[in-house]
Amino acid sequence: MDKFEALKIWEHEYGDQEYAHDVIGRKIKRSDYLMNNQVGWVVTYMRPLNQGGTNDEGNTIILHHHTALEKGDNFPEFYVDSIKYIVKYEEDGDFYYIESSEERDDNL
């Protein structure tokens, strides 16, 4: 995805804020799209395309680049810092969202 398209998604999610936090709380900076630094971010899919996800607004999410690496193609569950997250689907609104299960797995 080019930066122009990514920034349209940023504006939809965060407005004109220069800084925000991804779903797990990692700080991201609007101008640092695709940058591999402390506040860099990417646009990715909650349900990966190779697992039946769709390339539309209801399936995209902005994540810190470290969060995106940890999530990878894991679906519907993934772990970040030993905390379990679950991707859920809201059929009425046709969108995915992520919830924390508050369950830690210290064996990871």
Task: Describe the function of each predicted region.
Residues 28-63, 68-75:
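Histidine-centered nuclease catalytic patch
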Residues 1-42, 64:
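Short cysteine-rich loop/turn motifs with clustered Cys
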Residues 14, 45, 99-100:
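Short, isolated positions within intrinsically disordered regulatory regions of eukaryotic proteins
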Residues 52-58, 69-108:
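Polybasic, low-complexity binding patches
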